[in-house]
Design a protein with these regions (language model features):
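Active-site C-terminal subdomain of aminotransferase-like
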Residues: 206-209, 216, 221-326, 339
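Conserved PLP-binding catalytic core of the aspartate aminotransferase-like
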Residues: 301-311, 316-352, 360, 366-367, ...
């Protein structure tokens, strides 16, 4: 059997659909975010990064870098094992306590990523509670979908942010059936924000747990950066919160925050937690420093809001197809995978602007887009240059997408 031909066949299909993913080879410039060096066939060029999830630029913050350097000098590079076998350093213990405090929960549990946290927790909850029925928003992240699927239990998908549809589904479940509503606070591709209070109302009415993914909100929203639930004053009503250390906090890793019994049960039964090496101590130290800083500082959040408001306003003035939403995400609709990649390739090669095309399966076919993420450190001149470049490209739209392909190839 020709196994290689099977691989090539699938790759060719991606190329034909225009959604084969190409990674940009970047080296970020420490202390000079959002600039980076882009390594390509034509050489190395400086670019401005417009699509990073390092939303607040905390990966570059001196307090985070200092904490990581100090941890390496104190304990070395790796953790040395799983959490159960020598891999629980004091940094991990302190970080979990800080996260529990951040979200107002009894406990927190660290994972190597928020993807693993979602996957492991949601699948393990179904093992711990046989017959658990899951009610999941249709736009939930792949990690949540995978965790629900692997659990193998009964699930119902409700229309995105549709409270009436969710209640219709909840009404059909027997009162004594264990239930959990799984949703996100900020949906990263559209920028929509969930009606958390209304969902909590339904959870209380029908006796369901709530599981909230705050991955794209922690650090960015709320008086101490705990997310949308904190901002809206409903954090105490959410049973389990999932978060990341890799976006707003600028480092790496994921976690859940919940009751002591819930976290202990996941700690004791989730394979994705048990059978993997723990986060490096320096990572934990950096995340700890970032969280502590953002609990006290409003500077980064205030500046982010202003930058996002500026970018959205200028895009609207330029009549660019920016998708309206109340969050920090700035999606610009293209609607075709080939066209989308051609536009982003042209931005990179001709304008030294890096933004990644977002295609299926991340978004539905026909809704391909660019996803811009302004940060506190994007300057007025960088914003003006971006708007000018996009305006030039959109002015060329009548000549068809072939013109973008030609420009990108030059």
């Amino acid at each position: 059997m020709d196994y290689e031909s099977r691989f090539r066949q699938h790759l060719e299909a991606l190329h034909e659909e225009g959604r084969y993913r190409v990674f940009a080879d970047l080296k970020r410039r420490c202390g000079a975010y959002p600039t980076a060096d882009h390594f390509a066939q034509g050489g190395v060029h400086g670019v401005t990064v417009w699509c990073s999830n390092d939303y607040l630029g905390m990966s570059q913050h001196q307090v985070v870098r200092d904490a990581m350097h100090e941890a390496i000098e104190e304990v070395g590079a790796g953790s040395g094992g799983t959490r159960n076998i020598s891999g629980t350093t004091h940094y991990h213990v302190e970080l979990e306590a800080e996260l529990a405090d951040l979200h107002g929960k009894e406990s927190a549990l660290l994972f190597t990523s928020a993807y693993i946290a979602n996957d492991s927790t949601l699948s393990t909850l179904q093992r711990l509670m046989p017959g658990l029925v899951i009610f999941s928003d249709e736009k939930n992240h792949a990690s949540m979908i995978e965790g629900i699927r692997r659990g193998g239990g009964e699930k119902h998908i409700f229309r995105h942010n549709d409270i009436e549809h969710l209640e219709e589904l909840l009404q059909r479940a027997p009162p004594q059936t264990p239930k959990i509503i799984v949703f996100e606070s900020v949906y990263s591709m559209d920028g929509h924000i969930a009606p958390i209070a209304a969902i909590c109302d339904l959870a209380e009415k029908y006796g369901a747990l709530t599981y909230l993914d705050e991955v794209h909100a922690v650090g960015l929203y709320g008086p101490r950066g705990a997310g949308i639930a904190e901002r809206d004053g409903v954090m105490h009503r959410v049973d389990i919160i999932n978060g990341t250390l890799a976006k707003g906090f600028g480092v790496m890793g994921g976690y859940i925050a919940a009751s002591r019994a819930c976290c202990d049960a996941i700690r004791s039964y989730a394979p994705g937690f048990i059978f993997t090496t723990s986060l490096a101590p320096a990572i934990a130290a950096g995340a700890l420093a970032s969280i502590r800083h953002l609990k006290r500082s409003e500077i980064e959040r205030a500046r982010l809001k202003e930058r996002v408001r500026t970018v959205k306003g200028l895009m609207t003035e330029a009549r660019l197809p920016v998708m309206e939403n109340p969050s920090h995400i700035v999606p610009v609709m293209v609607g075709d995978p080939v066209h989308c990649k051609a536009v982003t390739d042209t931005l990179l090669t001709h304008y030294r602007i890096y933004v990644q095309p977002i295609n299926y399966p991340t978004v539905k076919r026909g809704t391909e887009r660019m996803r811009f993420t302004p940060s506190p450190v994007h300057t007025d001149s960088e914003i003006a240059y971006l708007i000018g470049a996009l305006s030039e490209l959109w002015a060329a739209c009548p000549v068809g997408k072939g013109e973008y392909v030609r420009l990108a190839a030059e």
